[in-house]
């Protein structure tokens, strides 16, 4: 049985990456450096834009984060794909929070828009995930819209983020 708390610390997220938070069969978050959040501040089964579930998480920004040193030299900016991956990570985390089992895999996204950037001078990135649908059959899948904010300003949106949980990924 999953302990369905409303918030999770960095240590909780690291435990998820080790397969300890949602059990041996539950989905795992990636380990650092690909773990793109420091904490989950809110998780609910209702709420969000569609009243079908909501997740909000945060990443503290500092100039020493690994991607600023290589993307780009002399023009550091967080790669937009990392913000997109963070949203997929949170959809999979939510499926585990609901009790889903399997290995999480991103299955797609409808549309992504980038209207801003994360620079090393920023303080905090906030991710907001609004669930539209959860499929809980042979395939467990989450469908959601997401937003990325930097210091309170909306900079990315994504529609129809899809993540599935698979018992066997050998044929995937």
UniProtKB/Swiss-Prot annotation:
Example of a GO biological process term: fatty acid biosynthetic process
Catalytic activity, EC: 4.2.1.59, 5.3.3.14
Pathway(s) annotated for this protein in UniProt: Lipid metabolism; fatty acid biosynthesis
Induction profile: Mainly activated by FadR, but minor repression is also conferred by FabR.
MF terms (GO), sorted A to Z: (3R)-hydroxyacyl-[acyl-carrier-protein] dehydratase activity; protein homodimerization activity; trans-2-decenoyl-acyl-carrier-protein isomerase activity
Signal peptide: none
A Pfam family hit: FabA
Outcome when changing residue 102 to D: In allele FABA2; TS
Alphabetized UniProt keyword annotations: Cytoplasm, Fatty acid biosynthesis, Fatty acid metabolism, Isomerase, Lipid biosynthesis, Lipid metabolism, Lyase
Active site, renumbered: 71
GO CC annotation: cytosol
Coiled-coil zones: none
Domain of life: Bacteria
Keyword Plastid: no
UniProt keyword annotation of Acetylation present: no
Effect of residue 76 to L: In allele FABA6; TS
Function: Necessary for the introduction of cis unsaturation into fatty acids. Catalyzes the dehydration of (3R)-3-hydroxydecanoyl-ACP to (2E)-decenoyl-ACP and then its isomerization to (3Z)-decenoyl-ACP. Can catalyze the dehydratase reaction for beta-hydroxyacyl-ACPs with saturated chain lengths up to 16:0, being most active on intermediate chain length. Is inactive in the dehydration of long chain unsaturated beta-hydroxyacyl-ACP.
Subunit structure: Homodimer.
UniProt family annotation: Belongs to the thioester dehydratase family. FabA subfamily.
Protein name: 3-hydroxydecanoyl-[acyl-carrier-protein] dehydratase
